[in-house]
């Protein structure tokens, strides 16, 4: 992480008293941050550390300090999620042979565990930033490599979408999430203030942004956070931009932003932990159902097309990750096959959903995400997912799970959709739920919702 560390050193010299971190009620200047990193380096130097060191801490401030201190010691941080169940932590430590884990009580060293990632293996991945994990929505989270050059390329295109007066970046999610860690390093590398939270709280986040009168804030959020924020938002002049990522923004949120925060610069990103950014929609210039236009340094193709021209999205760019741990390296000139299906029409990218979410009903491919987006345009539906359950005649049938104040009939849903989708795309059954359950990254937990529905718990 040579470039980002040098940039941080420059900011410490040129503006030592500027606020680098504003986490909850704590503010830390660039000079103070440097001193705390130096202190952490001195503490960690007492130990014989292995090449990869896991960080599993509840405190964002301590996590940031440890992350940067490990880089000064030329170690690779592995960012773990503090909210994972202890069984998941143990399984991951065992699977990847992690011998050193920095937790809330200090450094824990597993001397007896076999080391899976060693210095020889890391030679194939120069200039690593960290080892991260996918969201793990369908199983055990998967470890991947992220190098510095890829995020420096992302910073460059991201900067083009920032407003000139934005001097602070807020990302209230956990640092183990790619979006939050990205926003942190983007802020520190560019000499801005990073605003974060231990636990997302919309009112407290707005209060943080108001606390320093000079703040002009760009917020990096997932759609569920934007939805919560709009419930307490009231002409917040310190907030300049919403950068939304992690899932498609529903049209209902677009409408709320237009009504409540029309002066906000709204940028919707589409990307993944592995690919980083793929496309963007600036201030709704793209059709609302699309995820915008490709970034200039991204190439895209689709393969394995169905009869509707929908295919698997493949990406090539200099913002790509370096590969999964234990698998082959990924180079910038190689095509990476995503788990997303979609198509490009008139330069705009449209997503039809993840491959594992696709339903096959009577031999027809059904992409729930497309129908779900249409359904959330109804004022009666807040959120919606369509799950597939086994059916003897058709193989599967679609079941709509939706939240909202209005209880709908199947006839209501059929009437709303009949001119928008094909007949076989209309869910066969509907079920109203009091609330949706979410993954740690803010997406609807489809697997959990389906399991609960099948067990009669919704």
Curated annotation (Swiss-Prot):
It comes from the Bacteria. InterPro entries: AMP-bd_C, AMP-bd_C_sf, AMP-binding_CS, AMP-dep_synth/lig_dom, ANL_N_sf. GO terms for molecular function: medium-chain fatty acid-CoA ligase activity. It holds the Pfam family AMP-binding. CDD domains: AFD_YhfT-like (cd17633). Gene3D superfamilies: 3.30.300.30, N-terminal domain of ligase-like. Its EC number is 6.2.1.-. The keyword Lipid metabolism applies. Belongs to the ATP-dependent AMP-binding enzyme family. This is Putative long chain fatty acid-CoA ligase VraA. The gene is vraA.
């Amino acid at each position: 992480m040579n470039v980002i560390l040098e940039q941080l050193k420059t900011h410490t010299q040129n503006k030592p008293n500027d606020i680098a971190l504003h986490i909850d009620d704590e503010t830390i200047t660039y000079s103070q941050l440097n001193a705390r990193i130096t202190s952490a380096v001195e503490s960690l130097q007492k130990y014989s550390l292995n090449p990869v060191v896991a960080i599993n801490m509840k405190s964002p401030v301590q996590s940031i300090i440890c992350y940067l201190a490990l880089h000064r010691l030329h170690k690779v941080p592995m960012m773990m999620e503090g909210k994972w169940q202890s069984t998941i932590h143990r399984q991951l430590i065992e699977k990847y042979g992690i011998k050193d884990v920095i937790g809330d009580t200090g450094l824990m060293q597993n001397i007896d565990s076999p080391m899976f990632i060693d210095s020889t293996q890391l030679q194939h991945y120069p200039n690593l930033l960290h080892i991260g994990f996918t969201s793990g929505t369908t199983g055990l989270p998967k470890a991947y490599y992220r190098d510095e050059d890829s995020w420096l390329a992302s910073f460059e295109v991201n900067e083009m979408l920032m407003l000139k007066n934005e001097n602070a970046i807020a990302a209230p999610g956990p640092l183990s999430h790619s979006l939050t860690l990205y926003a942190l390093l983007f802020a520190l590398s560019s000499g801005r203030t990073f605003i974060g939270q231990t636990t997302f709280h919309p009112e407290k986040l707005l209060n943080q942004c108001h606390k320093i009168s000079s703040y002009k804030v760009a917020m990096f959020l997932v759609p569920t956070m934007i939805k919560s924020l709009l419930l307490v938002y009231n002409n917040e002049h310190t907030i300049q931009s919403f950068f939304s990522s992690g899932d498609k923004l529903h049209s209902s949120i677009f409408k709320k932003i237009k009504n409540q925060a029309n002066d906000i610069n709204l940028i919707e990103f589409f990307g993944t932990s592995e690919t980083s950014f793929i496309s963007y929609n600036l201030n709704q210039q793209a059709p609302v159902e699309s995820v915008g236009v490709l970034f200039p340094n991204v190439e895209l193709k689709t393969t394995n097309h169905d009869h509707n021209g929908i295919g698997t999205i493949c990406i090539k760019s200099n913002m790509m990750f370096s590969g999964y741990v234990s698998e082959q390296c990924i180079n910038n000139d190689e095509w990476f096959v995503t788990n997303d299906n979609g198509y490009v029409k008139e330069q705009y990218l449209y997503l039809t959903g993840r491959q594992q979410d696709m339903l096959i009903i009577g031999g027809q491919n059904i992409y729930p995400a497309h129908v779900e987006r249409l359904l959330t345009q109804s004022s009666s539906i807040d959120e919606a997912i369509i799950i597939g359950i086994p059916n003897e005649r058709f193989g599967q049938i679609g079941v709509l799970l939706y939240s909202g104040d209005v209880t709908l009939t199947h006839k209501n849903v059929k009437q709303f959709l009949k001119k928008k989708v094909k007949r076989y795309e209309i869910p066969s059954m509907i079920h109203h739920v009091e609330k949706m359950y979410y993954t740690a990254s803010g997406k609807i937990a489809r697997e959990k919702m389906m399991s609960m529905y099948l067990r009669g718990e919704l």
